[in-house]
């Protein structure tokens, strides 16, 4: 009983093994390379020649696959090593460029741009100061010009009044001394009378002067004074004697002296104003020059800083462009290396597949030649033409 079971088991094992061999043959036959090998083997079987030479050829082919794979492995290892070196160099370059980019950006944002803002503010401040001092200087000069014009007008008014009073005094003095205006044949103590013509002349002089001085901008009181003198002149014929007229002359002298004193005070005040103006103007000019010098220095510093900023920005642009270029080169190189890896893997798989086919075929020829012959014959009977 045990013998029967063992025999059945052996039969089942043989049947299973033969089935596996047939599956292997069919699998090999499905590949173009395997079909070519089987076609070659079938031709050899048809000639009846020993298959030793074919087995030797297949063995050499298998060995060549192994050698080629080793050579390919070495080339791939060398190529991937070069890829690693290149990628590492790109990464190092990118790291250095990014570090430089960060430094440049930090210098711009943390140092140069704030400095520029400060200098721009300083320039604006100094421009405002220069403008303010220049305005003060212009206003000071304008005020001085206005004061001088006012002074000249006052001097002219004083001079006009002096001329008017001096002329009136002359008329009084000349006519009181001229015998043609004094009635003769009377004692010296008798009153001296002015003629009507003299009175009219003096009255006209003061009336005209009153109208003229009414246009004065500063000493408008002269007009009233000269109107009063005109009234006095209209009554000059009624003056009792030359002593009364002399009082008028003395009054004129007193007025002339007061006008002279007033003019002296006016000139003194003008001198003080000029002195004060010169001092004030000197202070403003000094402040203007200091502010102008500070402005020039600030503008120069700003221009120099802008040059530095332009250089740093240009360096930053160059660095950013380098990062883009190196990144693109790294991507291209990485892609090449990955494609090479894929090509190597595909070639290795294809070579391994062909090697497996050769190895399996050698095994079939050496161990399962009968089954292989039967399957090739069946394939031939099925219509497969070699």
UniProtKB/Swiss-Prot annotation:
<keyword id="KW-0732">Signal</keyword>
<feature type="signal peptide">
    <location>
        <begin position="1"/>
        <end position="19"/>
    </location>
</feature>
<comment type="function">
    <text>Structural protein that crystallize inside the trichocyst matrix.</text>
</comment>
<keyword id="KW-0175">Coiled coil</keyword>
<feature type="propeptide">
    <location>
        <begin position="184"/>
        <end position="238"/>
    </location>
</feature>
<dbReference type="GO" id="GO:0055039">
    <property type="term" value="C:trichocyst"/>
</dbReference>
<feature type="coiled-coil region">
    <location>
        <begin position="51"/>
        <end position="154"/>
    </location>
</feature>
<comment type="similarity">
    <text>Belongs to the TMP family.</text>
</comment>
<protein>
    <recommendedName>
        <fullName>Trichocyst matrix protein T2-B</fullName>
    </recommendedName>
</protein>
<feature type="propeptide">
    <location>
        <begin position="20"/>
        <end position="48"/>
    </location>
</feature>
<feature type="coiled-coil region">
    <location>
        <begin position="294"/>
        <end position="325"/>
    </location>
</feature>
């Amino acid at each position: 009983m045990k013998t029967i079971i063992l025999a059945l088991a052996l039969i089942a094992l043989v049947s299973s093994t033969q089935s596996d061999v047939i599956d292997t043959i069919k699998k090999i036959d499905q590949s173009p390379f395997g079909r070519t090998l089987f076609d070659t083997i079938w031709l050899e079987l048809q000639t009846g020649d020993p298959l030793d030479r074919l087995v030797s050829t297949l063995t050499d082919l298998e060995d060549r696959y192994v050698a080629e794979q080793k050579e390919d492995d070495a080339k791939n290892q060398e190529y991937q090593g070069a890829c690693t070196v290149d990628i590492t160099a790109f990464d190092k370059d990118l790291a250095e460029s990014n570090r430089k980019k960060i430094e440049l950006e930090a210098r711009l944002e943390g140092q140069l741009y704030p400095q520029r803002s400060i200098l721009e503010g300083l320039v604006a401040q100094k421009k405002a100061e220069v403008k303010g001092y220049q305005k003060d200087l212009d206003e000071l000069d304008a005020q001085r010009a206005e004061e001088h014009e006012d002074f000249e007008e006052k001097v002219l008014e004083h001079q006009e009044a002096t001329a008017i009073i001096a002329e009136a005094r002359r008329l009084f003095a000349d006519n009181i001394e001229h015998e043609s205006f004094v009635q003769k044949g009377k004692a010296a103590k008798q009153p001296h009378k002015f003629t009507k013509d003299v009175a009219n002349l003096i009255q006209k002089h003061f009336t005209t002067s009153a109208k003229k001085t009414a246009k004065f901008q500063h000493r408008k009181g002269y007009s009233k004074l000269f109107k009063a003198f005109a009234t006095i002149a209209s009554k000059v014929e009624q003056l009792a004697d030359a002593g009364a007229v002399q009082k008028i002359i003395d009054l004129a002298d007193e007025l002339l002296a007061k006008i002279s004193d007033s003019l002296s005070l006016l000139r003194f005040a003008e001198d003080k104003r000029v002195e004060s103006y010169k001092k004030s103007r000197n202070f403003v000019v000094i402040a203007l020059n200091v502010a102008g010098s500070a402005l020039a220095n600030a503008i120069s510093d700003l221009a120099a800083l802008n040059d530095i900023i332009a250089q740093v920005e240009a360096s930053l642009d160059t660095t950013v462009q380098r990062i883009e270029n190196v990144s693109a080169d790294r991507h291209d190189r990485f892609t090449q290396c990955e494609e090479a890896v894929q090509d190597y893997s595909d070639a290795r798989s294809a070579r391994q597949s062909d090697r497996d086919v050769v190895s399996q075929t050698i095994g079939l020829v050496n161990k399962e030649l009968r089954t292989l012959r039967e399957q090739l014959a069946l394939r031939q009977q099925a219509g497969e033409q070699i």
